Amino acid sequence: MSCQQNQQQCQPPPKCPPKCTPKCPPKCPPKCPPQCPAPCFPAVSSCCGPSSGSCCGPSSGGCCSSGAGGCSLSHHRPRLFHRRRHQSPDCCESEPSGGSGCCHSSGGCC
């Protein structure tokens, strides 16, 4: 091979075109979301239905307490004779309305 042929093969590739400039950011900053009220235990609507006559809140340990009366507080250990009724320390008894009444560790109810 001659020297000229080698030089032609070794030329660097053509330069890439410059990248597109990024789009300008929007002029207005995004609006701040409205401030939320102080967080509370799960809202009654997301926890227990009013038809079951039960409520949810710190007084019941964040659990749904049904009319049949059965909320196993997460910080209370089930007693031996209650072992069959309380399968988990974070669970409530079934509610008359058909809801499971289970309490999640965050204090919410299914």
UniProtKB/Swiss-Prot annotation:
Biased composition (Low complexity): 1-10
GO molecular function: identical protein binding
Name this protein carries in UniProt: Late cornified envelope protein 2C
Region described as Disordered: 1-23
Subunit details: Interacts with CYSRT1; the interaction is direct.
Composition bias, Pro residues: 11-23
Induction trigger: By calcium and UVB.
Protein function: Precursors of the cornified envelope of the stratum.
Expression (tissue specificity): Skin-specific. Expression was readily detected in adult trunk skin, adult arm skin, fetal skin, penal skin, vulva, esophagus and tongue. Not expressed in the cervix, rectum, lung, colon, or placenta.
Alphabetical UniProt keywords: Keratinization
Extra remark beyond the main annotation: Belongs to the LCE cluster present on 1q21.
Record family assignment: Belongs to the LCE family.
Top-level taxonomic group: Eukaryota
